[in-house]
Amino acid sequence: MPGKSSLEWHRHYRDRREELEDFWGRRASAPNLRARYRVFGASVSMASNHECAAAAFELSHPQFSQVPGNADDLPGYELQFAVDPGRETTDVPDDLSTHMRRFGGGDWLLIDAGIWGSAHIDLRARTAHFILSPALARRPDLISSCMNTVILNLFIGSAGAGMLHASCLLKEGGERMLLMMAPHNTGKSTTALRLVQAGYRLLTDSMVFVRETSAGTQLLGFPVGRIKLRADVRREVVAANAAIEEWLEPEEVRSETKHSLDLRRYRPECVQSEAVLVPPCVDLCLLERTGKLETTLRPALAQTVMEAVVANSLYCDRDEVWLPNLELLSRLVEGADCFHLAAGTDVASLVGVIEGMGERP
């Protein structure tokens, strides 16, 4: 009878399934470790066949602003890691990021780390699949910095959060916020460190995410409390305070070795770890370095600021992602007091000019 035959084949398949050739490596890559995290309040599910994924997440997770409670109304993300034991390679170089290539088409992205691994991302499904060599599995720090955090930031933007490439600092009990935008290597991080030393709290020195919540416009940072200094600035900072040198760690950034200062470890009281709502007073500065002694300030048009946002914060992506995000950023800019800040070399002048912005009516 047809029904009986069907049942026999089902039984035969179940009995022989584990003997079938693992042509696609599904059996070898099947996860046996699972964990769940919260990133900006959204759920992130992690599955892996190797403990390196959990180790990488322990490095990635604290770099995102904490959000009180759970944002279960936000879409969740899934990341699956598979270490291929047959893909043994040479050791992974510390400057792995300079060896990586990125490709994109539609909702699919690929991060290619050559012989050491790759990550395939489906933005619409909010999933990422990592294939790693054992050598890369031994470097959870590089998995975190070159893959994990990059992909999580992509998902956050695709979920509707606008992003500014800016430093964000707070003062006066959080009632005053300073945002500083500048191209790479033009003094933004140096200025941020000087303001931290003058009593400001740092949310982030790199990426400020903006999203609307029922309580108001929320700002979140990545990486939280971390400042990256050029080699010449490092020498200047260490000359002024030798004790800071032990807290500086070399890090490859855009084919350049910078020195990262994690304020969460060095001076945790100077870090704004939790996400914040936009306060009543927001100063947004387009920063430039002049080499002169004195710092000067002049008003900036919101249109000029938005042009800088497009130039410094965006990369080629789909219009359906960027246009709503830019609308969010535009509302933030229009509600801020905008300036051109020409940062001088005299610290007292710099701090004095910035403090003066908060004394206006």
Per-region residue spans from a language model:
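A noncatalytic interaction/capping subdomain that flanks phosphate/NTP-handling catalytic cores
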Residues: 1-184, 193, 197-201, 208-361
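Conserved lysine of the Walker
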Residues: 188
